[in-house]
């Protein structure tokens, strides 16, 4: 098993190119199931979750050319309607094949998903919506089985904004009979990207990016060529890296409008953020001010940047309160940060972070994707050597992480244990 070794304490400087967004690429790859013929998608990142999705779609009969960058998918002949546990167990986004399969073929059998162990993330919202669209859905032996001759348009309300649920039902509704309204829909940029792809296929989706999405079902969709948006979470991670190391990084290829909540907090913390054509400059000033964070669905502060921001607050001046409202059990990185000298107390769904000025390198263990990123940032800021184990979590969501940080001047390397 690999681990990452970091010699910290060096300001990071230079340029970093942001990869395509994993959380946009996964549903867009699944959307190919709605069509016959060759879909072409650009800016696909080379990540473990992408490779898992590739295997999953191929197991269903999808022909795929390419592994990253530009890939082509042809779902003209679906030979299997079951997404098996062996493929689904490592990645929750696997549930995204459920809606497209039921919509196009009238049947699907998908194993209950796995992925990061950061809370329940229930699929009941997906199931309830499909049932309201006329599908017969049962849970049997760890699988979701859904059947419908043709899904019917429906007036749907999500009890809470759900990114995966919004995406799944948007895709299902694209081939349904009639109009579907998704109320209290998630508003993330990745949902807007998916809606653009669906409309390119001939779907009639409006309102993506708001909390009410309207989908008028059509009889048939056609293949499309489309681009994946840049990864706002990767961009945010490198922006925070500039702050936590007192560095100066030009973040290329990011979309500023996707980063509003983070930018505001980084400026409050004393960083310099300067937009330019094609990206932004993020620079630390040497002194980090404490800021309070409350995670919220988009356009609020993203839960996927909470752990990284905590690493920065661990070396800030003063006291910060970080409140997690989106997922439960998302403070599993706290114990590892404390091994490096951080002063953090958990009170319910809040973490009270008292800045200590400097962290010390230590052996630490990743518990999930974003927690692992926070430990990398802490290691980059710390004095001495940090060894991060279980780095397969990082490989699920960060493309060429060591290479990109090395290009910014970090002493970081991967070794096999």
Swiss-Prot record:
Residues binding UDP-N-acetyl-alpha-D-glucosamine: 92, 304, 326
GO BP: cell division; cell wall organization; peptidoglycan biosynthetic process; regulation of cell shape; UDP-N-acetylgalactosamine biosynthetic process
Protein name, as recorded: UDP-N-acetylglucosamine 1-carboxyvinyltransferase
Function: Cell wall formation. Adds enolpyruvyl to UDP-N-acetylglucosamine.
HAMAP family for the chain: MurA
NCBIfam families: murA (TIGR01072), PRK09369.1 (NF006873)
Gene3D superfamilies: Enolpyruvate transferase domain (3.65.10.10)
Entry annotated with the keyword Cytoplasm: yes
Highest taxon listed in the record's lineage: Bacteria
E.C. number(s) listed in UniProt: 2.5.1.7
Reaction it catalyzes: phosphoenolpyruvate + UDP-N-acetyl-alpha-D-glucosamine = UDP-N-acetyl-3-O-(1-carboxyvinyl)-alpha-D-glucosamine + phosphate
Compartments reported by the entry: Cytoplasm
Modified residues (2-(S-cysteinyl)pyruvic acid O-phosphothioketal): 116
InterPro entries to which the protein is assigned, alphabetical: Enolpyruvate_Tfrase_dom (IPR001986), Enolpyruvate_Tfrase_sf (IPR036968), MurA_subfamily (IPR050068), RNA3'P_cycl/enolpyr_Trfase_a/b (IPR013792), UDP_GlcNAc_COvinyl_MurA (IPR005750)
GO CC, alphabetical: cytoplasm
Primary subcellular site in the record, as a coarse category: cytoplasm
Gene source species: Syntrophus aciditrophicus (strain SB)
Pathway in which this enzyme or protein is active: Cell wall biogenesis; peptidoglycan biosynthesis
Similarity section: Belongs to the EPSP synthase family. MurA subfamily.
List of catalytic residues: 116 (proton donor)
Keywords: Cell cycle, Cell division, Cell shape, Cell wall biogenesis/degradation, Cytoplasm, Peptidoglycan synthesis, Pyruvate, Transferase
Positions contributing to phosphoenolpyruvate binding: 22-23
């Amino acid at each position: 098993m690999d681990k990452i070794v970091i010699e910290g304490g060096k300001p990071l400087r230079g340029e970093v190119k942001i990869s395509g967004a994993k959380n946009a690429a996964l549903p867009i790859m699944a959307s190919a199931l709605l069509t016959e013929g060759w879909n072409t998608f650009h800016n696909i990142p080379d990540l473990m979750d992408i490779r898992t999705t590739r295997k999953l779609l191929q197991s269903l009969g999808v022909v795929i050319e390419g592994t990253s960058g530009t890939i082509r998918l042809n779902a003209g002949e679906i030979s299997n309607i079951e997404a098996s546990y062996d493929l689904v167990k490592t990645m929750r986004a696997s549930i995204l094949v459920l809606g497209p399969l039921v919509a196009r073929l009238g049947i699907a059998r998908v194993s209950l998903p796995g992925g990061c162990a950061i809370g329940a993330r229930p699929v009941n919202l997906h199931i309830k919506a499909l049932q309201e669209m006329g599908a017969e859905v049962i849970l049997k032996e760890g699988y979701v089985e859904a059947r419908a001759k043709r899904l019917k348009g429906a007036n749907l309300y999500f009890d809470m904004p759900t990114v995966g649920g919004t995406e799944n039902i948007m895709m299902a509704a694209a081939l349904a009979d009639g109009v579907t309204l998704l109320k209290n829909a998630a508003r993330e940029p990745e949902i807007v990207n998916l809606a653009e792809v669906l409309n390119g296929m001939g779907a009639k989706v409006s309102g993506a990016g708001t909390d009410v999405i309207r989908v008028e079902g059509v009889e048939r969709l056609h293949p499309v060529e489309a681009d994946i948006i840049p990864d706002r979470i990767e961009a945010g991670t490198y922006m925070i890296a500039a702050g936590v190391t007192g560095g100066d990084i030009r973040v290329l290829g990011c979309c500023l409008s996707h980063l509003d909540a983070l930018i505001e907090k980084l400026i409050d913390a004393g960083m310099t953020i300067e937009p330019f054509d094609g990206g932004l400059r993020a620079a630390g000033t040497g002194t980090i001010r404490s800021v309070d964070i409350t995670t919220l669905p988009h356009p609020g502060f993203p839960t996927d940047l909470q752990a990284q921001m905590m690493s920065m607050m661990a070396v800030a001046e003063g006291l910060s309160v970080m409140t997690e409202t989106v997922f439960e059990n998302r403070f599993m990185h706290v114990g590892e940060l404390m091994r490096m000298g951080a002063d953090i107390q958990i009170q319910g769904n809040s973490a009270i972070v008292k800045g200590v000025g400097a962290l010390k390198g230590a052996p630490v263990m990743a518990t999930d994707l974003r927690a692992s990123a926070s430990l990398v940032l802490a290691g980059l800021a710390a004095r001495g050597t940090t060894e991060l184990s279980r780095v397969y979590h990082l490989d699920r969501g960060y493309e060429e992480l060591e290479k990109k940080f090395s290009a910014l001047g970090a002493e970081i390397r991967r070794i096999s244990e």
